């Protein structure tokens, strides 16, 4: 009988990416892989799109809020139903372990696995834990973290960032689409790539639309999340979504303007790519991106600009400063020890699963 592992995590692409890195490795080693998530969530979309041999199990999910809302009452019942569904799934499958990447949907499967005596491994990408992982930590066997946590927690293993970016651009797949884009760009201009993510692209889209003069100063690549904005014209490439083209576009850019999500930040760090961080504020998030951005700026990896300060004047000043000190930023990023390979983490996780099973 093949070994089985359950994955969970969703709500944003960031809560799925690491799972999609690990899953093929388990499949290659003969494991049967199952995924618990929201059928209407990004996790189901990404699993379907991946084409991986994964069985998806849908559960009810409710949002966990730190503030009062009448929706909390309805969501209590959704979470309770999700827990019952998760208990049934875990009891039926009897997996060797569960791995969670976080997000609201992950809490019921984590609790269910713990109640049924299954080892639970969770991962936290941000400088501080979100509410879902604060709850999940209580039920976890081990928590792996990208950042060193300020609180000394007994079940935490500081891992660093796990990323599969190509450090050698020659390894990247060739793209005829990329060649077509280059024909519209000027070799005399720096190329900027704007990455807003699923929650933060709108501000960048509006900034570029409001300031057409940017196209006279730079070649602009704008990942918009909105197919209505798709455009390829002189010095401008706007595209709603990219997959295989993502890393080639990052490599093509002289500088990346990004939000403060940890996955993208550490991909840029792994590539030693010059970048400006415009983090989501507390009005649009729990403040984790502000913490991530400050962490990167203090270590000399990047410069940050707060969203309310994103004016053309401030943007131009930030660009000038980054390009003037480009060599210093790149040297600091190249010297980092905060990046781990997927193989390293997979081997560590496999070893920890084996140890947890033996200790039962």
Swiss-Prot record:
GO terms for MF: undecaprenyldiphospho-muramoylpentapeptide beta-N-acetylglucosaminyltransferase activity
Transmembrane segments: none
Membrane topology label: Peripheral membrane protein
EC class (word): transferase
Gene3D superfamilies on file: Glycogen Phosphorylase B
EC number of the protein: 2.4.1.227
Cell membrane found in the keyword field: yes
Keywords, comma-separated and alphabetical: Cell cycle, Cell division, Cell membrane, Cell shape, Cell wall biogenesis/degradation, Glycosyltransferase, Membrane, Peptidoglycan synthesis, Transferase
Localization: Cell membrane
List of residues binding UDP-N-acetyl-alpha-D-glucosamine: 198, 289
GO CC annotations, alphabetized: plasma membrane
Catalytic activity: Mur2Ac(oyl-L-Ala-gamma-D-Glu-L-Lys-D-Ala-D-Ala)-di-trans,octa-cis-undecaprenyl diphosphate + UDP-N-acetyl-alpha-D-glucosamine = beta-D-GlcNAc-(1->4)-Mur2Ac(oyl-L-Ala-gamma-D-Glu-L-Lys-D-Ala-D-Ala)-di-trans,octa-cis-undecaprenyl diphosphate + UDP + H(+)
Family: Belongs to the glycosyltransferase 28 family. MurG subfamily.
Functional description taken from the UniProt entry: Cell wall formation. Catalyzes the transfer of a GlcNAc subunit on undecaprenyl-pyrophosphoryl-MurNAc-pentapeptide (lipid intermediate I) to form undecaprenyl-pyrophosphoryl-MurNAc-(pentapeptide)GlcNAc (lipid intermediate II).
Protein name: UDP-N-acetylglucosamine--N-acetylmuramyl-(pentapeptide) pyrophosphoryl-undecaprenol N-acetylglucosamine transferase
Lineage, uppermost ranks: Bacteria, Bacillati, Bacillota, Bacilli, Lactobacillales
Gene: murG
């Amino acid at each position: 009988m093949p070994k089985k592992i359950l994955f969970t995590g969703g709500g944003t692409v960031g809560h799925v990416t690491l799972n999609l890195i690990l899953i093929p490795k388990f499949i290659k080693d003969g494991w049967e892989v199952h995924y618990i998530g929201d059928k209407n969530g990004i996790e189901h979309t990404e699993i379907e799109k991946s084409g991986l041999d994964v069985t998806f199990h849908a559960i009810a999910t409710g949002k966990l809020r730190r503030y009062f809302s009448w929706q909390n009452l309805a969501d209590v019942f959704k979470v309770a139903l999700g827990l019952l569904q998760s208990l049934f799934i875990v009891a039926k499958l009897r997996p060797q372990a569960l791995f969670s990447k976080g997000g609201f949907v992950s809490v019921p499967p984590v609790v269910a696995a713990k109640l049924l005596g299954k080892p639970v491994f969770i991962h936290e990408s941000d400088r501080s834990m979100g509410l879902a992982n604060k709850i999940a930590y209580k039920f976890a066997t081990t928590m792996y973290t990208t950042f060193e946590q300020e609180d000394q927690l007994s079940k935490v293993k500081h891992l660093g960032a796990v990323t599969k970016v190509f450090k050698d651009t020659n390894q990247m797949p060739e793209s005829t689409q990329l060649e077509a884009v280059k024909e519209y760009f000027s070799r005399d201009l720096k190329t900027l790539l704007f990455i807003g993510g699923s929650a933060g692209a709108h501000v960048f889209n509006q900034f570029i639309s409001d300031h057409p003069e940017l196209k006279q100063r730079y070649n602009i690549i704008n990942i918009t999340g909105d197919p209505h904005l798709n455009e390829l014209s002189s010095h401008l490439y706007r595209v709603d979504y990219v997959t295989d083209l993502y890393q080639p576009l990052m490599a093509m850019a002289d500088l990346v303007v990004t939000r403060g999500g940890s996955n993208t930040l550490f991909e840029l760090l792994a590539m030693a790519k010059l970048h400006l961080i415009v983090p989501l504020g507390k009005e649009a998030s729990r403040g984790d991106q502000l913490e991530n951005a400050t962490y990167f700026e203090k270590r000399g990896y990047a410069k940050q600009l707060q969203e309310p300060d994103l004016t053309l004047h401030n943007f131009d000043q930030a660009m000038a400063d980054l390009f003037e000190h480009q060599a210093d930023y790149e040297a600091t990023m190249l010297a980092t020890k905060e990046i781990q390979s997927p193989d390293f983490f997979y081997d560590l996780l496999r070893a920890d699963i084996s140890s947890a099973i033996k200790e039962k």
